[in-house]
A protein has these predicted regions:
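Boundary/entry segment of secreted carbohydrate-active catalytic domains
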Residues: 176, 222-269
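Primary recognition of N-terminal secretory signal peptides and signal-anchoring hydrophobic helices
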Residues: 2-205, 234-248
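Catalytic domains of carbohydrate-active enzymes, especially glycoside hydrolases
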Residues: 265-289, 345-357, 580-588
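Chitinase-like catalytic core of GlcNAc-active glycosidases
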Residues: 249-257, 275, 287-437
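Glycan-binding loop/region signatures in secreted carbohydrate-active enzymes
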Residues: 236, 464-577, 609
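SH3/SH3-like beta-barrel fold
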Residues: 98, 196, 209-213, 221
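Acidic/aromatic/glycine-rich contiguous surface patches that form carbohydrate-binding/processing clefts
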Residues: 577-610
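Alpha-helical scaffolding within the catalytic cores
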Residues: 235-240, 262-270, 298-303, 340-347, ...
């Protein structure tokens, strides 16, 4: 029997030994670090010989550069997103532009030459290359006008970009170790780290620490392999240019003067007769008249001379709204057309001797935002060279108008005007104030996030809207809808485009405030003057009620079964808005438009803008 058990015991022992060896092998496998080195081209996701990895401030970008004939190029979108959004690519005329405080830099695609205004300069390679999708800009040219540093490395091709200046943390390796793609010994090795090799510490952990090397490789090192940390400082040698502005040594008290024909210029004396304290007037003289940047003009030397005799500056307004056949986008997106428009405006300023230009371009699409800002930049240079004040009119800030880039406007223009009115407009689905105090305060506060107070002018209304709610016969059982029209024979509104665009966007997003229930009336409105509002109140024996929420009087009355609602603009409501101007120490105020105000309103205005 014993002899029979010997083979069984031997076999069992062998099995145990095998199992032990298997377990030991498994344990060794589990705790043995991987020696696999990852291909860095795969790590950077490079797919071609021309591809260049971009490492920006210790982050690997999805975007790639291009290595063309030994020069690194970055695509236009990457440049604007990460390095410098002041570059402008004209895809229609294949021209790269950059605007400084004093010069317009330009380079044509595939050219080694570039111009600083009229002075020619050159590099030993093309400055910009273009294809059907975008433009690629030489990195050394970008560096001339941008606050970043770069280092070009090969094997594989990559560029280390730095834009974040200040303190950063480093640590030396206490021993030879490995930099791995992820935190774990089984993660592939990205680089071998020598003893005392210094790395930048990005994120510390108990077991693994995220670091970057001087070669732009980002990964993880065992925390215990690192020595004591130290703080170092990155500094930039870039000298930021200074932008100067024409700033008046008085508070701006400006009023827009709507001029619809040449004969209207002769009314200037009567229009100014009952005003007080006006020091700037903005006549609506110019508008885009074709797709080549030519303008229609209603300018008058006699008008300017009269205003100058009264100590009033003339800032002529240029608009894009009057000629509906003009494609503003076509004008703004061609450098040659912008140049023609600007030259026409400057020539008119010199010819008629007016003091400033007030740009009022409205109803733009977001796609033209960059081109519009480039227009403001280019116009500002010509204005500055000729001592002409440049001001720009803007809607109150919203997500739908962010592309107007008020911060960049303020960098180049002398003044920015926030048109704090048209809160409710001809297309509104509900009756409401033209400019409630909350709307004004919010508009000013949000604009001040981008525009310095000493450059911001508050635009205020001299008009109000009369809303009428006419009952609808609902006996048919048909769905009743709210309809709004603008029976505006007084032509008092500047525009309702921004508000209408915002409403359309709301509806597209499903966030419109319109009610789902049937509204048993049609809604109409028209804008009219302060004096006309007072007549309506008196004629209908209406009782104004002060609204603290709106910062103005509210009136409601009925006539022939129709309900009328008015949020009154008068001295009381205007004073609330002027307090906002004063409290925020703004550059001044402006009013739309002359002729709609009560003469007594000026006594209130000069209390705050003297």
């Amino acid at each position: 029997m014993k002899k029979k058990f010997v083979p069984i015991l031997a076999a069992g022992a062998l099995i145990v030994v095998i199992i032990c060896f298997m377990l030991l092998g498994s344990i060794i496998e589990k705790y043995t670090p991987s020696k696999e080195h990852m291909n860095l081209s795969d790590y950077y996701n490079l797919s071609g010989e021309q591809d260049v990895a971009l490492i920006l401030d210790n982050q690997i970008l999805d975007a790639k550069g291009k290595l063309l004939n030994g020069t690194v190029y970055l695509d236009y979108e990457t440049v604007c997103s990460y390095l410098n959004d002041r570059f402008y690519w004209d895809h229609n005329e294949n021209k790269l532009l950059y605007t400084t405080a004093t010069d317009l830099i330009s380079a044509d695609a595939d050219s080694t030459s570039y111009y600083v205004t009229k002075d020619s300069h050159s590099l030993d390679h093309p400055i910009v290359k273009a294809d059907a999708q975008t433009a690629y800009i030489a990195i050394d040219f970008l560096k001339l006008y941008s606050d970043f540093s770069y280092e070009v490395l090969d094997s594989p091709n990559r560029v280390i970009l730095t834009t974040a200046w200040g303190d950063y943390t480093t640590a030396p390796a206490k021993q030879k170790t490995q930099l791995r793609q992820k935190g774990g010994i089984k993660s592939p090795i990205l680089a071998d780290i020598g003893k005392n090799m210094e790395v930048t510490v990005l994120e510390t952990g108990d077991t693994w620490t995220k670091v970057s090397t001087a070669e732009g490789i980002i990964g993880y090192i065992k925390s215990k392999a690192l020595g004591a940390t130290s703080t170092k400082t990155l500094t930039s040698d870039y000298v930021a240019e200074e932008f100067t502005h024409i700033k008046k040594d008085f508070k701006i008290n400006m009023a827009w003067h709507q001029i619809t024909n040449a004969d209207a210029n002769t009314t200037i004396a009567s229009v100014l007769q009952n005003t007080k304290g006006i020091n700037v007037i903005s006549p609506t003289w110019f508008y885009l008249n074709d797709n080549n940047g030519n303008i229609a003009s209603l300018a008058s030397s006699d008008y300017v001379n009269y205003c100058h005799q009264k100590g009033i500056e003339v800032w002529a307004l240029v608009s894009n709204l009057e000629n509906k056949d003009v494609d503003t986008t076509s004008v703004l997106t061609y450098t040659s057309k912008r140049e023609n428009l600007i030259n026409n405006l400057i020539s008119a300023a010199i010819q008629y001797n007016f003091d400033g230009i007030n740009v009022d371009f409205e109803a733009l699409s977001s796609e033209v935002g960059d081109s519009y800002i480039q227009f403001i930049r280019e116009l500002s240079l010509k204005c500055a060279n000729n001592g002409i004040v440049l001001s720009v009119d803007d809607y109150v800030p919203s997500s739908f108008t962010a592309f107007y880039n008020r911060a960049e406007q303020a960098t180049f223009a002398d003044y920015v005007v926030v048109m704090a009115y048209d809160e409710h407009y001809a297309g509104s689905e509900e009756a409401g104030s033209v400019a409630s105090i909350g709307f004004v305060k919010e508009g000013v506060a949000n604009t001040l996030k981008e525009v310095p107070a000493d450059q911001l002018i508050l635009g205020m209304p001299f008009y109000a809207r009369v809303w009428s709610e006419t009952p609808v016969d609902d006996t048919t059982g048909a769905d009743s809808t709210t309809q709004t029209s603008d029976n505006n024979n007084n032509d008092t509104d500047e525009t309702d485009n921004a508000a209408a665009d915002a409403q359309a966007a709301d509806e597209a997003a499903g966030t419109s405030d319109s009610a789902d229930s049937y509204q048993l009336f049609t809604l109409d409105s028209y804008a009219t003057s302060m004096s006309e509002i007072q007549k309506l109140i008196s004629t209908n024996a209406a009782e104004p009620v002060w609204s603290d929420i709106d910062g103005q009087y509210y009136v409601q009355y009925e006539n022939n079964g129709i309900t009328y609602k008015i949020w009154v603009e008068d001295a009381a409501s205007l004073e609330e808005k002027l307090k906002v101007l004063q409290e925020n120490q703004l550059a001044g105020g402006s009013f739309w438009k002359l002729g709609l105000e009560l003469p007594s309103i000026w006594d209130t205005i000069i209390k705050y803008i003297n």
